[in-house]
Amino acid sequence: MREIISIHIGQAGIQVGNACWELYCLEHGIQQDGTMPSDTTVGVAHDAFNTFFSETGAGKHVPRAIFVDLEPTVIDEVRTGAYRQLFHPEQLISGKEDAANNFARGHYTVGKEIVDLCLGRVRQLADNCTGLQGFLVFNAVGGGTGSGLGSLLLERLSVDYGKKSKLGFTIYPSPQVSTAVVEPYNSVLSTHSLLEHTDVAVLLDNEAIYDICRRSLDIERPTYTNLNRLISQIISSLTTSLRFDGAINVDVTEFQTNLVPYPRIHFMLSSYAPVISAEKAYHEQLSVPEITNAVFEPSSMMAKCDPRHGKYMACCLMYRGDVVPKDVNAAVVTIKTKRTVQFVDXCPTGFKCGINYQPPSVVPGGDLAKVQRAVCMISNNTAVAEVFSRIDHKFDLMYAKRAFVHWYVGEGMEEGEFSEAREDLAXLEKXYEEVGAEGADDEVTRG
């Protein structure tokens, strides 16, 4: 088996995790208590969904996941929520005091006390796998736990499981909406780790997803639940081929191979189509070319940046539902002839496609309509640098005055780490710029 372990860190990671596991259970017909009426081979772990769920002798399906937070309130919601019987209590790890939006607390002081416990639980999950393929790590980098403890866990996973892939689903601060003054610090310090210790990181930001909910689903005031359900559709589409047997499967390591031209250039944009409410879906049949065009629209991007300002290095299109390869090829040819979608000279073809015949499921009573076919795109575009330059600019404004720095130093950080992380990001922005500007003949070396 090629098992995947999911690690959900901090409030954002846990709440996105809840939405994902709710959706996986629906897709596989797993009940809230972990039983699966349709599973005829009870206790036999050769079904495709066993990549994400382990099976007990009694036929209970347990997610291969851990949830970690430095304070208990968010995890307590899982402990008392609808899916409380799905998880083993040891998979839900919470501390007593939170990271107070401080990277240094999550990484050095409070986080240090809990990290060994987390790694012990991960080790138990890993020992239960026959061929562990890698980790999915969910966190936000604006807060203290997601950024600090998230980085610490990634660093330790690199030591313990060097060769295993690590995919991050990372929620970045939004351009306009802020939940903490020190978000730029936490993000820059955390990205410094993501650069080193993840193989692929998919960037998400709440503001972009708010706009999609408002525009496409007519939700006037989207809640985190609305956002997370949309995010979970993307993550589900990415992992469909690991959980179901499909036509053209895409493996986690294949993402890496196809999307990452240079090790550090691994921050991805994602988009999903159709995002459509039940009222509208009733009147529209969305064809493969239509949904394929939709995922290339700037307004479909799940992070606030405009792909037209950059060039694509590669993109993965994951179709699911009623889709045949012939339609996909035709749609891709049409996109290639469009002048709005530009590729860097070095990768003129740049498309990797996957098809899975399992149609998308939706949460009953949710906002998304049940559709026959959907597509999710993960793309590597140089415009992603916009996300970093925005955060770097805010970082610089605060750091020039050394504002709030004492909170970090007081928790055992050194001031040098700020400038080191900031320089690392400056180099990353430059690297993106070079890839976008590259001609066919000038070789640029990238560290």
Curated annotation (Swiss-Prot):
GO terms for molecular function: GTP binding; hydrolase activity; metal ion binding; structural constituent of cytoskeleton. GO terms for cellular component: cytoplasm; microtubule. PANTHER family: TUBULIN (PTHR11588). CDD domains: alpha_tubulin. It is found in: Cytoplasm, Cytoskeleton. Gene3D superfamilies: Helix hairpin bin (1.10.287.600), Tubulin/FtsZ, C-terminal domain (3.30.1330.20), Tubulin/FtsZ, GTPase domain (3.40.50.1440). It is an enzyme of class 3 (hydrolase). One of its GO terms (biological process) is microtubule-based process. GTP binds at Q11, E71, G144, T145, T179, N206, N228. Tubulin is the major constituent of microtubules, a cylinder consisting of laterally associated linear protofilaments composed of alpha- and beta-tubulin heterodimers. Microtubules grow by the addition of GTP-tubulin dimers to the microtubule end, where a stabilizing cap forms. Below the cap, tubulin dimers are in GDP-bound state, owing to GTPase activity of alpha-tubulin. Its cofactor is Mg(2+). Pfam families: Tubulin, Tubulin_C. Its EC number is 3.6.5.-. The keyword Magnesium applies. It catalyses: GTP + H2O = GDP + phosphate + H(+). This is Tubulin alpha chain. Its main location: cytoplasm.
